[in-house]
């Protein structure tokens, strides 16, 4: 299975990381636009009397637009590279955001949100091959983790700036001038700083390198399914956290926006740490399964705490928001590694299409559920999605280039478990304590009296 270049030909480490940082900034600007309407929901309710379900639908418009073009951008990515795609996509997103900011009708506003989402899809697909092409396997988890902080950092900045911008403006929609400016700057940065990684030309590639990876196994399909299911908690927490804090816990817009920003910054740090963790254990997908289990537990706790109106509900919401964003970088890294350099763009486009379908459908569905039954039942339903993802994760599949490291880690875990079960230290000396003594007696076949 081809994974692209494994060394940075002609580029220093600093130059490679600069490319990752620029890719991060470009993608973060796009996500400020994609998720920006969610932070306009309080202003839309107050200024225009927009119902929560309708406001949730408006916040989904960029996602609907992304669904229409993600695979197309992925195809262009495989053909022309990241530099062109990021530049053109950022420029088009800037134009659409500026036009949406000056719309007075809801229909016109929604239409430009869809068009902007179609353009912003370019930034969502691009960047993965920059990591797989410029970084060796043992650094890709960390590099992709840094690159994938774009979404939570973009959302954090949007949560901090857009509600204040909307409150200070005559129209809530004028707040979208902020992402329009950022996307215009991003287009310039892409031209100046992005360098596409080296790879063979299409006519020089072997038949195996050009072969459809979906015909070889179900691994990519399972990763797509998992990432789509785990997108629901991420979308629900991002969309409704601000209004939930304001309506249910009487937070001011400044405080609520600050808490959303805090959760996204923590999520960004978490993505980097989880990416590094995946490099160390030699697996991208085993941590994803652990994150799925954590998501189920946290959302169940949040539903219960919110039902009781407990003060612990707010930190649980922050925790749920953090856990919900941790997995995405691992799945994107796995896609680029398994799909190879000639299919990674289309594979990421397909994965992001499934994610955006869930992201587009979740806000109006959960907005209606919240309006009719309240937040606790909505959180319970939201927790079912990571629960469904747990058995689908192909956790035993090892990334190309890290098989030896993964097997070494498995051997070390087995050796630690055997040592623990034996009741001795690794050098053979007995461990102190009643538990170790019972383990030694059990190993020798002697009866062990229950503790009193």
Q: Where do the model's predicted regions map?
A:
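Cytoplasmic membrane-interface "Motif A"-like loop-to-helix N-cap segments
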Residues: 79-89, 280-293
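Extracytoplasmic gate region of multi-pass secondary transporters
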Residues: 37-39, 219-264, 268
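Helix-loop-helix hairpin linking two adjacent transmembrane segments in secondary transporters
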Residues: 146-194
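Conserved MFS/SLC helix-loop-helix module at the cytosolic interface between two early adjacent transmembrane helices
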Residues: 68-104
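Cytoplasmic helix-loop-helix junction between adjacent transmembrane helices
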Residues: 112-151
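C-terminal transmembrane helical hairpin of 12-TM major facilitator-type secondary transporters
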Residues: 285-331
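Helix-to-loop junctions at the C-terminal end of transmembrane segments
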Residues: 69-81, 271-283, 370
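Flexible cytoplasmic inter-helical loops of multi-pass small-molecule transporters
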Residues: 192-213, 401-413
């Amino acid at each position: 299975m081809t994974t692209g270049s494994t060394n940075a030909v002609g580029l220093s480490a600093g130059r490679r990381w600069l490319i990752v940082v620029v890719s991060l900034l470009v993608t973060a600007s796009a996500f400020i636009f994609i998720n920006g309407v969610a932070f306009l929901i309080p202003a839309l309710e107050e200024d225009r009397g927009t119902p929560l379900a309708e406001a949730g639908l408006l916040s989904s418009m960029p996602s609907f637009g992304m669904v229409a073009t993600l695979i197309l951008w992925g195809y262009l990515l495989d053909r022309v590279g990241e530099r062109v795609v990021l530049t053109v996509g950022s420029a088009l997103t800037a134009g659409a955001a500026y036009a949406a900011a000056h719309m007075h009708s809801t229909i016109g506003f929604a239409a430009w949100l869809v068009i902007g989402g179609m353009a912003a899809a370019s930034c969502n697909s691009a960047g993965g091959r920059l990591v797989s092409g410029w970084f060796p396997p043992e650094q890709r988890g960390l590099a992709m983790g840094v690159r994938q902080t774009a979404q939570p950092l973009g959302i954090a900045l949007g949560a901090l700036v857009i509600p204040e911008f909307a409150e200070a403006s005559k129209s809530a929609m004028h707040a979208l001038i902020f992402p329009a400016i950022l996307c215009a700057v991003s287009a310039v940065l892409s031209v100046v700083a992005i360098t596409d990684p080296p790879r063979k030309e299409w006519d020089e590639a072997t038949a195996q390198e050009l072969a459809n990876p979906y015909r070889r196994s179900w691994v990519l399909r399972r990763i797509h399914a998992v990432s789509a299911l785990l997108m629901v908690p991420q979308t629900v927490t991002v969309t409704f956290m601000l209004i939930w804090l304001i309506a249910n816990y009487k937070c001011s817009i400044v405080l609520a926006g600050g808490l959303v920003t805090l959760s996204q910054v923590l999520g960004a740090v978490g993505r980097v740490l989880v990416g590094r963790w995946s490099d160390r254990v030699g697996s991208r997908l085993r941590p994803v399964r652990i994150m799925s289990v954590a998501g189920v537990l946290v959302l169940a706790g949040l539903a219960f705490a919110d039902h009781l109106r407990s003060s612990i509900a707010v930190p649980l919401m922050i925790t749920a928001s953090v856990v919900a964003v941790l997995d995405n970088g691992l799945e994107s890294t796995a896609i680029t590694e398994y799909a190879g350099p000639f299919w990674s763009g289309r594979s990421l486009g397909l994965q992001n299409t499934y994610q955006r379908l869930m992201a587009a459908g979740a806000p109006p569905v959960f907005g209606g559920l919240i309006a009719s039954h309240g937040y606790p039942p909505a959180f319970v339903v939201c927790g079912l999605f990571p629960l469904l993802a747990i058995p689908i994760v192909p956790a035993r599949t090892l990334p190309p280039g890290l098989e030896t490291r993964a097997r070494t880690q498995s051997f070390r875990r087995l050796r630690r478990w055997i040592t623990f079960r034996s009741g001795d230290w690794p050098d053979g000396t007995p461990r102190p304590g009643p538990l170790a003594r019972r383990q030694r007696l059990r190993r020798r076949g002697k009866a062990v009296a229950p503790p009193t």
